[in-house]
C-alpha cells in the first residue's frame, strides 16, 4: 500500500462523507453494543436481526462500505447509549425511534412493522411517569444532557473507522500537524480551560507545556490512564468502547504538541471489549497511515501501544501506573520528580485520562473559546458521570460543568424511586465525599466541590435514599480503600486498617463517642502523611459522613441502636427469573457476599451482606430485590 499523503487523507474524508450520505438514504438500525447491553443479550438481537433480514431478502450492510441499496438496511453495532438500565437498546434512523428492553422474541415484529412497515411499536418504547417516548432526544434522561465527548457514542459503529472519518475524525490531528506549532497547541488547550478529568483537575495545557519545554530530551511519552477502578464507575470504559478513535486522536495531538513519538494506553484487564476496540482502532489507523512513521509526509512519527493492568486500584495513581507499564510492581513513589519531568522510563511524560484526551479533538477543531463557553469560568467543558444507586434512571450522564446535583439526580435521573426521600449522594468514588440535601443546588465543578470536602474524582455518583445508614456507607468505602492499599506507606497501610476496625466496632453498636474523635485523629494523620493522592483522600468518605450525618454515628455510639440498621432491616435477594448470570453484582460486591456460576442465577449471603447497594446499582436487569424486615 502506498504511503498516505495529506491529499490522500482529504480523499479518504471525501469518500467517507459520500458513503455516509448514501447510508442516510436507507434505514439505519443501531443495536447498542456496549458492555451493559451485551450482557443483556444485545448480540443475540443483532445476530437475529441480521440473519432474519437476509433470509427475507432484505439487503443488509454492516459497515459503510457495504452495498445495500435504498431498499436495504444498515445494521450497526453502536457504542454505549448511556441508558444501560433499559437495554438492550435498538435505534432506528431516520424514523427516530428508540426501542427499550428489546429481546430476540421482539425482532420479528420489529422487522415486519418498523423496518418494512414504518410503524412504531408502542409497547417497546421507553415509558416514564406514564408517558411513552418515541424519540431518544425527548426522553428526560437524554434531553437534559449536553453531550460533547459522548456525542457520537450510540450513533456510530466504534469498529468502523470509515464512520469516524465521515464524522470529521482526525481532521483535528491534521490541523495540529500541519498548521500549528507545539507551543500553539499547548496554548490552545490551556486557553480552553480543559482540566484533567481523572480526578485532580490539573490544567491539561500546563501539563503539556511542561513536557514540551524539555527540548533537550529526545524521548518523551504520552500515556492515557484507562485504569478506571472506582466501584460503579464506567465512564472511561464507555468512551473506549464507543469512540476509541477520539482517544487516539487526542493522544496524537498531544504527541505533536510535546514532541513525543510513543503513546501507551493503560487499560484494566477487566475491560476486554474496550481493549478489543482500541486494538482494532490502532490497527486500522496504522493500516491507512495515520499512525506510524513519517505520518502524511510530515516527518512526525507516532506509535500507540496497549498495556493491560492487573486490576489494582492503586495503579490509577500516576507513578504507580508508569511503574506497572515498565513491568514493575504498581506502587506510588515520592514526588518530586513529577511525571512531566521523569515519568515513564524516567522520561518526560504527559499522563491524562481517557475523557481528557477525548475532549482534545473538539477543542482543536472548534477553538478554545467554543470549549470555554461550556461550563463555568474555572471549570470549562462538560463532565461525564456514572449515575447509580437509589435513583429511577441509572446510566452514563454528560452535563456542562456547573450543573447542579438536583438537575442530575431529579431532572436526568428521575428522582428517588418508591416514594422514598433523598438522603445523600456520594461523589468521586473512594476518594470523594458524601453530600446532603442542602447541597443539591451547589454547582458541580472542581472548586465548589472542594469547598464542600468532596471532589469530582473520576465521576461516580451514588444516590442514597432515607433507608441508608451513612456509617455503613463509610465502612463500605473504607473497606474498599483498605483492601486496595498497596501497603508501601505506613499511614495508608495501618491507618486505614485502624479506621475500618473502628467503623466495624461502631456499626456493631460496641463503640463510644471517643471513637468519633479517634476517626478524626486518624483521618488527619493519614491525610497529612500518606505517600500518594489515593491515601491522602482515602478518609474523605468517612469525614464527610461524620460532618454531614453525625446523627447516624450517634445512634450507634450513644443510643447503641440504629433505627435503620437495627430497626427495619433489608434483606437482599436476586430474582432467579430476572438474573442472567452476568456476574456484575458479584464483581461489585465489596464483601464477596454474592456467588454463582456464569449464565446461572446468582445468590446473596445476607450474613456477609452490608446492604451497601453496590449490587443493586451494578445489575443491568433489575434482578436485585430489597425485602424489608421488621
Where are these regions (language model features)?
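C-type cytochrome heme c attachment motif
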Residues: 581-588, 611-618
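Short hydrophobic beta-strand motif reused across regulatory alpha/beta modules
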Residues: 90, 585, 594-595, 615, ...
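Feature of Fe-S/electron-transfer and energy-metabolism proteins
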Residues: 1-578, 588, 599-600, 606-607, ...
